[in-house]
């Protein structure tokens, strides 16, 4: 089984979009577990804020590319467009940040809000 850690963020209609993302992810990955949702300031001048952020964890036999494809499908269903980033709009962003023991997005772990979410996730999964 592969261990999957992902981060989810939104700065647009935040409560609605976060709930939709959680529901969609739970439909795709029934054993998924989530931290609490926390608010953060935007990273970078282009993004509008505030953001809502959450971490999620699940185990699966799927390959990494299939999982990432499902994340992209959820983002597309929710209305994410490539032009939004340049406008500072993040309807939803679902990122695979750790695959088993491999950190895929080390810069994400440096964000201020991540420490709190990582501690929560360790309590949830017992690692």
Please give the residue ranges for each predicted region.
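Short beta-strand-to-loop capping motifs
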Residues: 8-10, 56-62, 98-101
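Flexible, gly/pro- and Lys/Arg-enriched active-site loops
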Residues: 43-51, 65-69, 73-127
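Short, surface-exposed acidic-centric catalytic microdomains
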Residues: 19-63
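Generic serine detector
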Residues: 7, 27, 36, 40, ...
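Short N-terminal binding/cap micro-motifs at the start of the first secondary-structure element
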Residues: 13-17
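Extreme N-terminal starter segment of soluble prokaryotic enzymes
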Residues: 1-5
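Residue-level signal for inorganic ion chemistry
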Residues: 11, 34, 95
């Amino acid at each position: 089984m592969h261990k999957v850690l992902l981060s989810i963020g939104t700065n647009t209609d935040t409560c609605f979009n976060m709930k939709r993302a959680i529901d969609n992810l739970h439909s795709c990955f029934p054993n998924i577990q989530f931290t609490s949702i926390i608010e953060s300031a935007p990273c970078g001048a282009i993004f509008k804020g505030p953001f809502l952020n959450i971490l999620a964890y699940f185990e699966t036999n799927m390959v990494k590319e299939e999982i990432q494809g499902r994340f992209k499908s959820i983002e597309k269903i929710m209305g994410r467009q490539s032009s939004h980033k340049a406008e500072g709009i993040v309807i939803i962003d679902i990122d695979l940040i750790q695959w088993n023991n491999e950190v895929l997005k080390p810069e994400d772990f440096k964000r201020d809000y991540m420490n709190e979410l990582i501690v929560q996730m360790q309590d949830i999964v017992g690692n």
